[in-house]
Design a protein with these regions (language model features):
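Rossmann-like dinucleotide-binding domain that binds NAD(P)(H)
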Residues: 1-50, 54-63, 159-162
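C-terminal glycine/acidic-rich active-site capping loop/insertion
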Residues: 13, 21, 40, 45, ...
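Alpha-helical scaffold segments in carbohydrate-active enzymes
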Residues: 164-167
Length: 168
């Protein structure tokens, strides 16, 4: 199986370091499962730094809990996939700092990969895509003389537009 390969690749990308030594255990937690669904590793990098990770596909109720923490002599960085808009920098002997995409201190590589202005989540355009998709579905259904899926009818209509104009 591939368990642990993604964590290894991400570790190499983030740190820029190659792994020299590994002590690991992999296995199956779920009874009768024939593939590995758990792995834990202790790592030694080419520069002598140490690292560890554990990975599992058998944590009940957990939704792909990817969490990364890199610690060094000047502080630590932490990122969690469940809160992708925040990178926490924890400098030694100073308060934690939350960094956001395109916010103050954004590095050029990060800015190049960020499509929106600071304060908007990366999924922001998806909300508009959902509105346009639902509106198109409703229009197509009406033209075909059919009923649109009731769940596709939660988009702004002309009355909402009128209320917006009246508000202004």
């Amino acid at each position: 199986g591939d368990i642990g390969t993604h964590a290894h690749n991400l570790t190499r990308f983030i740190t820029g370091l190659e792994v020299d030594e590994v002590a690991a255990e992999v296995g199956a937690i779920v009874p009768k499962r024939i593939i590995h669904d758990f792995g834990g590793a202790m790592l030694r990098f080419e520069n002598g730094a140490r690292g560890s990770f554990w990975v599992t596909q058998a944590a009940a109720g957990v939704e792909n809990c990817l969490r990364i923490r890199v610690s060094g002599t000047k502080g630590s960085l932490e990122w969690m996939q469940e809160f992708p808009q925040a990178l926490t920098f924890k400098p030694l002997n100073a308060p934690s700092q939350n960094r956001t995409p395109n916010g103050p201190g954004t590095l050029p590589l990060s800015a190049r990969c960020t499509r929106l202005v600071a304060g908007h989540p990366e999924g922001f355009p998806d909300g508009f895509a959902n509105i346009y998709s639902d509106a198109a579905e409703a229009i197509a259904a009406r033209r075909a003389g059919k009923q649109a899926d009731p769940l596709a009818l939660y988009f702004p209509n002309s009355f909402d537009g009128l209320m917006g104009v009246r508000f202004v």
